[in-house]
Amino acid sequence: MSENLKFENIYCVGRNFAGHAKELGNKIPTSPLIFQKSNSAVNINETIEIPSNKTIEHELEVVLLIGKEGAPKNREEAHTFISGFSIGLDLTDRHLQTELKKKGMPWFASKTFKGSAVIDANFIHECPQEFYLTVNQKIRQEGNLKDMIFSFEDIILHLSKTVDFKKGDIIFTGTPEGVGALESGDQIEMGFNNCPPKKLVVI
């Protein structure tokens, strides 16, 4: 599926796992917390480039590929808008994000720098229940879909109140607990259980 892939809008969901909300000292939301990354943030390569003077943290997430135009009317129709599932990293400049939050400002600059939307472009048609991230062969994050506060359908329906979807839109659906900083030379492996992983190197 990766050969002819053209991404459009990139939507992201914050605090969709209670454990992650708690580890950052945030309240658990009562509706999906949506933010965006720019299209230029997409990184489907095998390398992650991080600035040497910044603390960039990984956030492992299931990524949805939207395959239909328009807006669904109900949960069943919402599911039909998903044409593929993959795994990705929402890279975050945590120090900048914290400063922006203190000032009551949007997170945009801390979330949408070049290469901050890392995606395995090999989308699959069924989503496994469990997913994971290792850094230097040590488990950093493990997630299970049953622990999501808002389901894929919840997220799509919530977004459709504001936007009409385009074919090629991407949704990062939230990260489980265990986020942490990346350093140059780190060897990363991310994937779904019992599926071929995506391997990356931090440079």
Which residue stretches match the model-derived regions?
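Switch II (G3) loop of P-loop NTPases
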Residues: 175
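Catalytic-core "active-site belt" of small-molecule-metabolizing enzymes
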Residues: 1-170, 178-203
